[in-house]
Design a protein with these regions (language model features):
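Active-site-adjacent structural elements that line small-molecule/cofactor binding pockets in enzymes
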Residues: 1-172
Length: 172
């Protein structure tokens, strides 16, 4: 449909948003992200009904409070099995996760002069993946916020609300 121009982007968010807005425990964000990506890939592949038994997700869900009627299902929608999945992270654990299971990462406010700080964690994820993954087949796509103004202070002022939201409103 998109001619290969679609990318799935996932982020673990932060405890204030996950617990305050979504109403679920923040728990283990890296484990949750890895499992979610594994499940998405199974759905995209459409090789059969999806079953998954992870720490965070079970499909079908047989936990307390369920009816027991759930059964493994196969998506009725045909999607490209190779849709790229990127994660958004700047934490070492999140970057290792991206290197291990994702096709790319969206580092928020990445300083290009400090790539080595991010790169080390990403490459540790490549090693954990154990499949010869490298920067040749992995995208680092920084999230960049731009404010153009001849007055440098006014440009900074335009960015302050975004920084406050992401750092104070979503962070912990």
């Amino acid at each position: 449909l998109s001619g290969g121009r679609f990318i799935v982007g996932l982020g673990a968010s932060g405890p204030q948003v996950v617990e305050g807005w979504h109403g679920v425990p923040y728990g283990k964000p890296v484990t949750r992200t890895k499992e979610y990506i594994q499940i998405m890939r199974k759905i995209f592949e459409r090789e059969g009904p999806v079953e998954f038994d992870g720490q965070m997700y079970q499909m079908p869900n047989r936990s307390e409070g369920t009816t027991g009627l759930g059964k493994p299902l196969k998506s009725i929608l045909a999607a490209a099995s190779d849709i790229p999945i990127y994660t958004a992270s700047i934490t070492p654990a999140g970057l290792r996760c991206a290197g291990e299971v994702a096709d790319g990462v969206f580092p928020v406010w990445m300083d290009p002069n400090k790539y080595d700080v991010l790169g080390e964690s990403i490459e540790q994820g490549f090693e954990k993946a154990g499949n010869d993954k490298s920067l040749e087949d992995f995208d680092v796509a920084p999230f960049v916020t731009v404010a153009m103004n001849d007055d440098l202070d006014a440009a900074y002022d335009a960015l302050r609300p975004w920084l406050a939201l992401y750092i104070g409103g979503m962070g912990a």
